[in-house]
Amino acid sequence: MFNDQSKTTSSVKGICATTDNNHGNLKKTNSTPFRKNYLLNGRTKLKLENFAYNASTEISSPKISEKKHSSLPIKRKNTFNESSTSFSPFTKAHKEITDDLKPDKSFTRKSDLNSQDMPVCFQETSKDLCRSSSTQHLLDHQTTDSTIIDMKPVSTNSKSDVFTLYTDETVLLRRCASDNKPLINNNLSSSNVSENQSRSFGSYDEVKNQGNNLHKVPSLVSIIRNARSSEQSRIAANSSCLLKGSDTEIDEDDFALEAEDLAALDSLERQYSQLPNSTVTASAKDIEKTAKVNHVGGDLQSYCSATKASDATINEEPVNLALDKACNSLPDINSDFIDDWDDSCDGCTPGELCEFSSEYTVLEVHEDFIFHEGNHFRQLKLILEANDILHQLFLRGDWTETSIFVGDSIRVEATFDKDNTAIVDNDKGLIIIHPKILMSATAVASSFPCLRKAVISDRVGIYGPPTKAMVTGNILHDFFQHALYRGIDALENVDINLETSIKTYISDIYFADLSLDEIREELDARLPLLKSIVERYLISKKNDNNNESIHISRLLDIEESIWSPRFGLKGNIDATVEVVLTEKPESSSTLTLPLELKTGRYVDNISHFAQSLLYTLLISDRYGINTNQALLCYLENSTIKNLVASNSQLRGLIMTRNSLAQHNFRRSLPEMISNRKICDHCSLVSECLFFQKMSDKGVANSNGLTESWNEWMREVKDEDLEFYKKWEKLLNQEERLLLLKRGDVLTFDTEELEAYGKTLYPLYITKEDIVCLEIDDRVFHYKFAFLNDNGYPRNFLHSGFSVGERVFISDEHGHWSLAKGHIVHIQDSCIEVRTRHRLHIPWLKMPNFDFKKNQVFFGNYEDSKLSFIGSNHTRYRIDKDEFSSGIASIRGTLMSSVLPDAPLIIRDMIIRLKPPKFCNSALIDPEFLKCLNEDQITALKKCHAAEHYSLILGMPGTGKTTTISSLIRSLLAKKKKILLTSFTHLAVDNILIKLKGCDSTIVRLGSPHKIHPLVKEFCLTEGTTFDDLASLKHFYEDPQIVACSSLGVYHSIFNKRKFDYCIIDEASQIPLPICLGPLQLAEKFVLVGDHYQLPPLVKNSRTSKDGLSLSLFKLLSEKHPEAVTTLRLQYRMNEDINSLSSELIYGGNLVCGSKTISQKKLILPKAHLSDGLPDSSSSLHWVNKLINPSHSVIFFNTDDILGVESKTNNILENHTEAFLIEQAVSSFLERGVKQSSIGIISIYKSQVELLSKNLKSFTEIEINTVDRYQGRDKDIILISFVRSNSKNLVGELLRDWHRLNVALSRAKVKCIMFGSLSTLSSSNIVSHLLKLLEKNKWIFTLNENDIATKFDENSSPIKDCSQVATTNNAKVIIRKNQRFFNSDNLCEKAILPQLEF
C-alpha cells in the first residue's frame, strides 16, 4: 500500500526506485547489489551455455519503427494507487507470504538494464502484464514494499495503423514453485563483476547468428533457482516434524554460486541487456490458430532453447475500445447462481470426464487478447510443467477471471494435443487450482451469496452449543437413512426407533438446553412429512397412486465420505442410491446418484442446489461414471427434486471452489460485500468486522453495521490488537506448512511417505469384525497385513504408527478415505483399525451394469457379495490423518481473548502482563502437606495465596505429579471447582491415577481409546447410557474436577461450566495461544512446567524462531519471577547422573532429594557372570566399563572404530552405534537386568526405528526419541548421538540444549552414551558436556579390537583388525561405505568395499 500519494519508494528484489504516481515513470536510483547464495552447479552452467548458444534457429533482428505515435492507455481493473480495491483480498496474504518466504532483504541486485534498451514486443504483452485482471493487484502491491511498474511505449508495425501500447518494461516472473514464493521482479544484472572474472561469450552479432535466446535467460535462471529452493522446502517440510529423525540440515552442502558460475551468468546478463528493442507483427486466421502460437512440447531444456514469443492479432479498432469491450463482455462467475436457478440443462451437457490428469506447476502466466469475428477477447496463457515436460494452456471465457499465480499447482481436465497445448473455455474443460487443498462441498456451497463468510468459517473455529434445529435434523437424518436401508419395514415401530434415536442424541439435547418433550413435539410434527417421502419415493414402484418419475430402488451407502483430489473437493453424502428415473412410460434408466436431505424450513435455497451438484463430481470420481444429476430431498414439502447440472453451473461451482482454495492457500480474505440486509443476519458478523479492523482498511466505510461495532471495540486497546496480530501471523505461518504437508499425503510416492512414517502400503485385509449398535449403527474392526511382493518381511511395530492414532484408509486405485478410524492394536505382523464405516469396493459393478442405462453396483449393504473383502485382490493403504490441525479453534480463542467481553485475567495478566498479586497468608490443612518436601510445601502455599496465578518450575524428577495431586486435594477441601489439563493425555491420566480414591468425583473428557485404562471409569464410553436428562446433568455438572487435554476444551460442557482454578501440567510444552482456551474458563490458574526442558513442538522451524515456540510459562516466569516456586529436590537420579543436568543446565540448583537416592547404584541379579571378565588390557574392556555398577555415567567414543553415520534421502542412521547398543543390551540381559528397566534414546527417529528393528525380539525395552521420553524414566538409559562425519556437522537438534537436558535426565542409575567425540565437540552445548565427562574421566575410547574379536568367524562384521587398512585414503573409503550388519541378521557379514591404496 502507498503511504504517500505523490511519491513512493519501492524496493523489489534488486530494483530501488522512486516513482511519481501522477506519471507512472520509474526512475532508478543507486542501490547496493548483493547476491543471493543460490546453488548453480556445473550442470546448471552447461544449461546456461547451451541455452545461450543454441544454433537450431537463426533469428534476424527486426527493424525498429522510428515513427512516434501517441499512447493509448490500456483499460485495467486495477490502478497503481491506494484506492485500488479490485481483488485486493489477496494483497495482504501475498505480503505475509513474502515476509515469510522471501530471501533476506539485503540480497538485492542492481539492474543495469536501461529502460530505453529493454527488448519488448507486442506478442510478449502477456509476459509483461503477467497477470489476469483478477490478480494484477499482486504486481500493483508486490512484496513488502509497494511496487510501481514502469509503463513505457512499445511500437508495433502493422500494415494497418501503427499504434503504441503501454506495457511493463521490467517484469519477468520467476517460477515460485511449491514453496509459495510470491511474484517478484527478476531483474538480472552484471554489475560489480569485473571483466577478468567473466568469460567472453562473443559479440552480440555472434550470439544473434547462433540463435537469439538470451532474452529467455532470466526465466531459465529462475527455474533452476527455484527447483533447488522448492526441493529444499519440501525436504524441510517433511523433516521439520522430526520424522525419520532428520534435523533439516539441508544446507550442509554449500548453496552458493561459484565464481565461474557468477562470471558466466553475468556475461549472459550483460549480453541480454545489450539486445535491441524489436517489433514483430503476427496474424491469425481464426481463434484456434491464435491459441497454438507456441510449440512448448519437450522438456525444460527445449523450453529454454526453443520457446518463441506468443502471437497476437490486432486490427484497426482502437485498442482502448477493444479492451473495454473484452473486459466488459466477461460474465460474472456467480451469474449462474441467481434466484432464477435453472435445474434443466442449458443445451450443452457435460461431456465424458477426461482421464485423470496430472498435476502441473504454473511457470508463467501471460495475459493477451485474441481477435475473433471482429472482436477482441481476453485470454490467459499458462506455461505449465509436469515431470519435466512443458505444456501450454489457454484459458478463455469465464476462466480468464481465475486468480492464478506463478508457482500454483493445478489440475487440468482437458485434452492436450501433440504439441502439448490445450484450451479451457466455457464449452469444454476445467482447471482445479491447488487440488491438494480439499474444499468441502458444504463450504463451497455456503459461499453464496458471501464468499467472505465461507472463508472466515474455515479460518476461525466457532464452537457453540448445538441448536434445536441441529438436534432434530440429526435425528431425522438417522431415521431417513434407516428408511432407505429398511424400506417399508422402517415405518413399523416408529415410536420405538424414535425413542432409541433420542437416547443416542441425549447429550446434544442436554447441551442445547432442550427438554425431551420439546424434541418429541418437534419430531412428531415432522415425522409424517418423512413418512410421506418414504411412501412416495421408496416403497413399491408399482403403487396404484404412484405417478412419480423418481423411484429410489436401492441404497448403496450412507454418509459416504469422498475425497477427490481430482476436483479438489471432499464431502459426506447423506446417501448414495440407485434411482430408477422414468422419463416416459416406456423408457426408464437406473442411475447411481447422490441424495441430500434438508430438514430445515427453507426450500429452494441456492446453497442447497450448489451442494447437491458438487456431489455429482464426487460420485463421478468415486464410482468411475459420468453423472450430472443429483437428488435433493426437502422434508418441509415432502418432495425430491432431480437436479441436472449444466456446464455453466459446474463451471461456476468449480471457479468458486478455486477462489476458496486460493484464499485458503494464501491466508487471505475476500472483500466485504457491504450488504446490510445480509450482514444483519450473519452469524459471523463480529468475526468479519474484526478481521476488517485488523486489515489496513479498517471498518469505517464497510457498511451500516460499523457504528455500534466501533463503539463496542473502543474498549479494546492497541496493545490488545498488537497481541492478536503477532500471534495470528505465527499461526498463519504454521498453518501454511501444515496445509502443504496434508496435501503431500495425496500426491507423494508411497515409498517416500513410508520413509517418513506417514503411510503403510501395500496392505490387504485379513479379518473383518462387525459390532452392531443401536438401530443400524455398526462398528467395524479390520486387521491388515503387509502384502510382501518382494518377500522382504516388514514389521508394523517399527512403522512409525502407534495405538490411538487417527488414520484413514484408501485403496491403490486412488479412492481416498474409504473409511476413517483409529488404531486399536499393533503387532509385528498385523495392525487393527476401528472404523464406523464399512470398507467396500465402490467401483465393483454388477454383471448387468451399463454406463448410461443401468448403473448398478454391489454397494455397502450387499453382505452376500462381500466375500471378496478378505482377498488379496485389492491393495489398501493406511495414512495418518493429519487433516485436522485445530488451528482454526486456536485462532478463534485468540480472537475472543482480545474482544471486550474477554475475561480480565486474560487481558490483564497475559496480554498486558500486569504483575500477579498474592495474599499474606493462606490456610492449608496440614494433612495435605504430609510427605511433601520444603519446596513442594512452599509451592502449595503460594498457589493458595495467589489472587491471579502461580507458577511451579519442576526440574527433572522433582515430583511435579505428586505436587499437583496434593494441590488438587487441598483445593477440593475448600470446595473449589478445578479444570485439569495438560499437553498430553498421559500426563492428565497420571495425575488422575494419584487422585483415585478421593472423595470428589471426576469427569474425564476425551476419546476413550486415548485414555488410560485405569481412569476410563471417569469418562463416557459407548456402553454408557442415560435414561433421562437429570442423570446426564449429574454426570457433567456435579464433579468438582473436569480433566482433558489442552485441546479438549472445545467440548460443549464448557459452555455450561466455569471453574475456580485451572491447573495446566506440562505448561512449558504448550504454545501460548493454546493455553488461552483453558484459562478463559477459570478465575485463577496454576502453570506447572520446566522451560529448561523441551519447548512447545512447532512444525515450522521459521515460525518457531519467530516465537510460536514461546510458552506462556516461560513468558510469565521471565517477566514475573516472583510468581515462580522452584522444585529443586529430585528423587530419580543418583549423584553422578544428577550432576550432568545440574551443572550444565541448572547452575547446580538440582540436587538429590536424599542420601539413598544419591548413592543408588545398578544391581546385577547375575553379577557372578561378570567375575570372569578380562582386565583392562583385554579387547573387551569396554564391556567391563559398561556393566560396572560403579560407573554410573560413561561415554563411549567411536572415533577410532570408523563409526560414521549414513545419510540417505535425508535419513540419518549410525549402524555402528546401533551395533554397540545391541551388544550392551545383551550384556545387561545376560546378567539378569529386566527388559523393562532398559530404555534407549536417540535424537533421530530414523535411528530409533533402526534400533527397534534390530532389537525387535526384546518387546519390553522402550526405544524412543527424546521428545517421547519427556516425563519418563528408566534404571538404565542408552543414548545414541548418531552424528559422526568428517565435516564435524552435528545438525540443529544437537545444538538444542533443551533436548540434551531431557536425554541426560531420564536414567536412574546408569546413563550410557555412544558418539563421536570429534564430531560432537563442534556443538557448543555438547562440548560442555564432553568437558564435564572428561573432567570426571567418564569417557572411554573404543578401538577396533573392542569389536573385531568379539565374534567368531561366522558372525564377525570385521573378522580381524588386519582387514581394516590403516592409510588415510582407505579409512575415508571405509567410513563412507561402512555397514556393519543387515537389519534382519545382526551377525551377517558386511561386504567390505574395494580399498584403493
Swiss-Prot record:
Matches recorded under InterPro entries: Dna2/JHS1_DEXXQ-box, DNA2/NAM7-like, DNA2/NAM7-like_C, DNA2/NAM7_AAA_11, DNA_replication_fac_Dna2_N, P-loop_NTPase, PDDEXK-like_dom_sf, SF1_C_Upf1
EC code(s) of this entry: 3.1.-.-, 3.6.4.12
Main EC class the enzyme belongs to: hydrolase
Family annotation (CDD domains): DEXXQc_DNA2 (cd18041), DNA2_N-like (cd22318), SF1_C_Upf1 (cd18808)
Any Gene Ontology biological process: telomere maintenance
Cell compartment(s), UniProt: Cytoplasm; Nucleus; Chromosome, Telomere
Gene3D superfamilies for the chain: 2.40.30.270, 3.90.320.10, P-loop containing nucleotide triphosphate hydrolases
Residues binding ATP, per UniProt: G954, M955, P956, G957, T958, G959, K960, T961
Keyword Metal-binding assigned: yes
Record has Repeat as a keyword: no
GO terms, molecular function: 4 iron, 4 sulfur cluster binding; 5' overhang single-stranded DNA endodeoxyribonuclease activity; 5'-flap endonuclease activity; ATP binding; ATP hydrolysis activity; chromatin binding; DNA binding; metal ion binding
Protein keywords: 4Fe-4S, ATP-binding, Chromosome, Cytoplasm, DNA damage, DNA repair, DNA replication, DNA-binding, Endonuclease, Helicase, Hydrolase, Iron, Iron-sulfur, Metal-binding, Multifunctional enzyme, Nuclease, Nucleotide-binding, Nucleus, Phosphoprotein, Telomere
Protein modification: Phosphorylated at Ser-219 by cds1/check2, leading to association with stalled replication forks.
Pfam family, one: AAA_12
UniProt: [4Fe-4S] cluster binding residues: C450, C679, C682, C688
One GO CC annotation: nucleus
Cofactor names: [4Fe-4S] cluster
Region described as Disordered: spans on this chain: 1-32
Assembly notes: Interacts with cdc1, cdc24 and rad2.
Function (record text): Key enzyme involved in DNA replication and DNA repair. Involved in Okazaki fragments processing by cleaving long flaps that escape fen1: flaps that are longer than 27 nucleotides are coated by replication protein A complex (RPA), leading to recruit dna2 which cleaves the flap until it is too short to bind RPA and becomes a substrate for fen1. Is a target of the intra-S phase checkpoint, associating with stalled replication forks when phosphorylated at Ser-219 and preventing the stalled replication forks from reversing.
Name by which UniProt lists this protein: DNA replication ATP-dependent helicase/nuclease dna2
Organism field: Schizosaccharomyces pombe (strain 972 / ATCC 24843) (Fission yeast)
UniProt gene name: dna2
